[in-house]
Swiss-Prot record:
CDD domains: PH-GRAM_MTMR9 (cd13211), PTP-MTMR9 (cd14536). InterPro entries: Myotubularin, Myotubularin-like_Pase_dom, PH-like_dom_sf, Prot-tyrosine_phosphatase-like. Acts as an adapter for myotubularin-related phosphatases. Increases lipid phosphatase MTMR6 catalytic activity, specifically towards phosphatidylinositol 3,5-bisphosphate, and MTMR6 binding affinity for phosphorylated phosphatidylinositols. Positively regulates lipid phosphatase MTMR7 catalytic activity. Increases MTMR8 catalytic activity towards phosphatidylinositol 3-phosphate. The formation of the MTMR6-MTMR9 complex, stabilizes both MTMR6 and MTMR9 protein levels. Stabilizes MTMR8 protein levels. The gene is MTMR9. This is Myotubularin-related protein 9. Homodimer. Heterodimer (via C-terminus) with lipid phosphatase MTMR6 (via C-terminus). Heterodimer (via coiled coil domain) with lipid phosphatase MTMR7 (via C-terminus). Heterodimer with lipid phosphatase MTMR8. Residues 4-99 form the GRAM domain. GO terms for molecular function: protein phosphatase binding. Signal peptide: none annotated. Its main location: cytoplasm. Keywords: Acetylation, Cell membrane, Cell projection, Coiled coil, Cytoplasm, Endoplasmic reticulum, Membrane, Phosphoprotein. It is a peripheral membrane protein. It comes from Bos taurus.
Length: 549
């Protein structure tokens, strides 16, 4: 297919762009295969470059010969274009709708993007499973790297290499895979160096109504236990939902078959419920006419902060089991690709200082989301504005980033990255020039040959010139476990995501810049103090030598 076939009117003059907190701009609107561009001849006017893949929905209005297109973006931005001529407006709208909903992944911008920067590090090879295993290999002698899934034949949503107990061979893993939803047999998610306890993750067991069992599965997770120790199975579903799953062939671990494990059920809502929550929240944030009571009522009705509280509570429980009770845990919901990954990731941020650094967090995203099979292509296909909702779209990853932001806000000195880093990840998960978030799992990414045909997001982020934008000036390495508060009073609406297009950030930006300047000045003064102390110590040493007989 040629993009030209979808572009009926490639260029329109005298188009007026309206954006909140910016003066209206008149210019020329151009459509390309992947971008909507508005360019003005006025001096000091910023051009608009908008990826078609970032467009969630459009509305059309007409007043006489003037047409208006309202573009609603996946990053929650709303842009208005006033276009002279009804035919031109209809053609532009038709092209935008077609170009923003391309069916083929290989027609998306990452396959056409050519970087203008020097690639210092190939991000596709920055966080390979073998490299991550090397970090633990000296301390986890009871574990091994298995390539049982190298052809993606055992589990289509797992990567080729996974970490499993050394006592379990590949034949046993194949049998366990037939007992777990989607073939997602239990694998290592995190090893707690402090006491050797682990977090494992999987899909639900396929016990069904007949109480089916799998001795290889029991042996696998029991291999993670120390003598005389019990473990915890954290099921992210309420008990009634887990019981209903048995009628569909799913279920949960029976106590009779797993006597050394205590099962705990939590109440994290499934992904389709989260989508409605996001729609309500964004709708409320965009309503500028409501009074305080109505705003607070609509915010509460969205249940967004309730979802955050439940996810963080479950992550804290997992971290507590590991760190304070010295118990290993297995985490799963139904598929093991959504709420499971939220909990395993957040538990690691609480427990592991490395996950709070920029590269450590990138490794976490790569390991616990991309390689672990979170279906980004489905979940991030649309955002909060699209009318034709599919059942698989859901802000699971955005909720995770929001939870991270809540912890970052409570521990502002313990994270090497800042809020802008989290916002950037949100934006690129929904629309990007990079191939990192394309596809639903490693199997799909291999078939698409993303490593050969697209650029990794990490290749761009990890350049020194970009890293400076995402570095937290308050960061001081903290090797302790951090315990976030999940009290309702401690959780806040993430204004940097949900209100950034509805209020000016000018004064916040100025305050942030001033804070950075103060910190840099303080470092300079500290360096001078240290220099003077060294000089004083040298002078005192010289005086002591001269006074000695």
């Amino acid at each position: 297919m040629e993009f030209a076939e979808l572009i009926k009117t490639p260029r329109v003059d005298n188009v007026v762009l309206h954006r909140p907190f910016y003066p209206a701009v008149e210019g020329t609107l151009c459509l390309t295969g992947h971008h909507l561009i508005l360019s003005s001849r006025q001096d000091n006017t910023e051009e608009l470059w908008l990826l078609h893949s970032n467009i969630d929905a459009i509305d059309k209005r007409f007043v006489g010969p003037l047409g208006t297109i309202i573009i609603k973006c996946k990053d929650f931005r709303i842009i208005q274009l006033d276009i002279p001529g009804m035919e031109e407006c209809l053609n532009i709208a038709s092209s935008i709708e077609a170009l923003s909903t391309l069916d083929s992944i290989t027609l998306m911008y990452p396959f056409f993007y050519r970087p203008m920067f020097e690639v210092i590090e190939d991000g596709w090879h920055s966080f390979l499973p073998e490299q991550e295993f090397e970090l633990y290999s000296s301390t986890i002698s009871e574990w091994r790297l298995s390539y049982v899934n190298k052809e993606f034949s055992v589990c289509p949503s797992y990567p080729p290499a996974v970490i499993v107990p050394k006592a379990i061979d590949d034949d046993a893993l194949r049998k366990v895979a037939t007992f777990r939803h989607g073939g997602r047999f239990p694998v290592l998610s995190y090893y707690h160096k402090k006491n050797g306890m682990v977090i494992m993750r999987s899909g639900q067991p396929l016990t069904g109504t007949n109480g089916r069992r799998c001795k290889e599965d029991e042996k696998l997770i029991n291999a993670t236990l120390r003598a005389g120790k019990r473990g915890y199975i954290i099921d992210t579903r309420p008990l009634n939902i887990a019981q209903q799953a048995r009628a569909k062939g799913g279920g949960f671990e029976q106590e009779a078959h797993y006597p050394q494990w205590r099962r705990i059920h939590k109440s994290i809502d499934r992904y389709h419920i989260l989508q409605e929550s996001l729609i309500k929240l964004v709708e409320s944030c965009n309503d500028q006419t409501q009074n305080m009571d109505r705003w607070l009522s609509k915010l509460e009705a969205s249940n967004w902060l309730t979802h955050i509280k439940e996810i963080l509570t479950t992550a804290c429980l997992a971290a507590q089991c590991l760190d304070r009770e010295g118990a290993s845990i297995l985490i799963h919901g139904t598929e093991g690709t959504d709420s499971t990954l939220q909990v395993t990731s957040l538990a690691q941020i609480i427990l592991e200082p490395r996950s709070r650094t920029i590269r450590g967090f990138e490794a976490l995203i790569e390991r616990e989301w991309l390689q672990a099979g979170h279906p980004f292509q489905q979940r991030c296909a649309q955002s909060a504005y699209c009318n034709s909702k599919q059942k698989w779209e859901s802000p699971v990853f955005l909720l995770f980033l929001d939870c991270v932001w809540q912890i970052l806000r409570q521990f502002p000195c313990s994270f090497e990255f800042n809020e802008n880093f989290l916002i950037m990840l949100f934006e690129h998960a929904y629309a990007s020039q990079f191939g990192t978030f394309l596809g639903n799992n490693e199997s799909e990414r291999c078939k698409l040959k993303l490593q050969q045909k697209t650029m990794s997001l990490w290749s761009w982020v990890n350049r020194p010139s970009e890293l400076s934008k995402f570095t937290n000036p308050l960061f001081e390495a903290n090797n302790l476990v951090i315990w976030p508060s999940v009290a309702p009073q401690s959780l806040q609406l993430w204004e940097g995501i949900f209100l950034r297009w509805n209020r000016s950030s000018k004064y916040l930006d100025e305050a942030y810049e001033e804070m950075v300047n103060i910190i840099e000045y303080n470092k300079e003064l500290q360096a001078k103090v240290n220099l003077l102390r060294r000089q004083l110590a040298e002078l005192e040493t010289e005086d002591g030598v001269q006074e000695s007989p």
